[in-house]
Amino acid sequence: VYSYTINKQKREKPMAHDLEIQNGKTSFASFREPAWHGLGTVFTEEKTTAEMLEAANLSNWNVRLEDMPIPTHLTSDKEYQYVVRTNPTDATQTDVLGIVGERYHTMQNEDLFSFGDNILDGGGRWETAGSIKGGRVVFGALALERETVLDPSGVADKVKTYLLINTSHDGSIAIQASITPVRVVCANTLNLALGSIKKKNGVKQSFKIRHTQTAKGKVEIARQTLGLANLYMDEFDLMAKAMFEKEVNAKTFNDIILAAYPKPEKDTKGAIKKWETKVDTINDLYTGEFNGMIAGTGWGALNALTERLDWARTARGGKQESLLAAASGFDAQINAEKNRLAKIVKTVLAIA
C-alpha cells in the first residue's frame, strides 16, 4: 500500500526563485559565492559529481514509476503512471512528480549528472546544482575553462562560459544542455542563438543530450559537448567584440529602446506609465553600477536590455515565476526575448 504526497511545497511559502524547499532544506548548492536568493549550500572546494548531488539534495531520489489506477466509472485504452521519488529530506515520504504515459522512462539525477565527470576531466568544475518546481525540474551548471575578455587593457569586461544541463521528472522536457556565457560583473546570462557573422548558418547554443549507460558513450558525449561549446564561444566572441566596438550615443540608445519596446499608442490600463517605468529601468541599468563602464557601446546597450530580463523585471501577469530559471538560462520564454533584443541591437547598429 502506497501513500503519496503531491509535491506542491505547501510547507513553505513559495518564493520567486522557485527553488525546492523541503523540511527547511533548500535543494541548491553554489560554488564560493552565495546565490542572490541567499539559500542553499555554499562550498569553497571543488566537488566531484557525487558530492555535488549530495550538497544540492539531489542524490538517492530513486525516481520510479507506479501504476495509476483508472477510476471504475472511466475507461481508457491507454495506461498512465505516476512518476514518484523518495523525498530527499524524509525517506518515509513518497512524492508524486508527474503523470506520464506508458512509454515514459525514468532517469535518476545520478545519470543526468554522470556525463559531467568527463567534462571535469577536461578542466571544468561544478558551479551550481539544484531542483525547482517541487523537484519536477533539476539542473546543474559546469564552469568551463573558456572565457572572453573585452578590452583587456581597458575595462577588461569578462564573460565566463558555463554548460547548463537540465531535465524534468514529469515528462515536460528532455535532457537539455545549453552553453551559457555569463558576464561576471553582474551575473547576466547571455545565452543567445548566434547567427554567424562570417557564415550563413548559426552554431548550436542548446541541444538535447542522448542518454547512454556506457562509459564510452559518455566520453563521446562530453567530447562533442566541449567541441560545440568552443564553436559557440568562437561566434560569441565575434559578436561581443563587434558590439563593443560600435559607439552608441544617447539618441541611438533611445532608438534601440523604441525599437525593442515601442511607446503605446493608447493609455489602456496604465500602459504608458508601465512603459515609462520600463524605459527608466533600462536607462538606469545602462548607466548604473554594472554597465556604466561599457555604456556608449552596443555591448552596453545589449547588457542593459538583457539585465532587466534577468534581474529587474516583475512577475508576468502578477504570478510567481522562476527568476532562477530565467537568470540561469533555462527559461525558454526569456531566452527567446533575449534573442529578439540582440537582433534589434544588431539591426539598429548595422552589425552583420
Language-model features, listed with the residues they occupy:
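Amphipathic alpha-helical segments
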Residues: 102-126
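Beta-rich nucleic-acid/ligand-interaction surfaces
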Residues: 128-148
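Intrinsically disordered, low-complexity regions enriched in serine/threonine
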Residues: 10-68, 130, 146-352
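An N-terminal amphipathic alpha-helical segment
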Residues: 63-81
